[in-house]
Amino acid sequence: MRKFLYLLYQPYKWLVYIPFLLVSTLVFGITAALLAIFVSPRLASFIGGALWAKLNCYVTPIFVKVKGRENVDKKQSYVIVSNHQSQFDIFVLYGYIGIEFKWVMKYELRKIPGLGIGCEKIGHVFIDRSDSEKAIASLKAARERIVNGTSIIFFPEGTRRIGNRLGEFKKGAF
């Protein structure tokens, strides 16, 4: 049954979801950049990030139920360290965690049209893993952004992994 559902989903994924993901990333990324420049990075993060993530969960479709959100103090800053199993980790965290935060992400993501400029203008932190001095400077910048209820999210593996095995953790998050 699972294989049948997988096969049934493939045309939808390639004809509807993937094109939607590409277009929505470009549109929401540019919108976020403009909002961050002219209105507020916080509003840009909500519209360009949280709304984009929830919309992509809906179109995928992924149904998310969050438990325990009432235990999170929105005025408190947190360092959140999460495993990175798929692209959907980003949708779930951005769309449903319910707090203001900045991502710490690999610099290569800066090159994605829409996404890169949107994330930069919102204030997310890019890590250049090929240059340790720049990486350390980026981590210091991340530490400075953990104020007034703004948190930081790391994926300590540095990238997604295929399968269920965890990758080796990088030092930056710790």
Task: Give the positions of each predicted feature.
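Juxtamembrane, membrane-proximal amphipathic segments and lipid-exposed surfaces
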Residues: 1-2, 83
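A general marker of short, structured functional hotspots
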Residues: 2-8, 13, 74, 165, ...
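A transmembrane-helix-recognition feature enriched in membrane-embedded lipid enzymes
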Residues: 3-65, 117-118
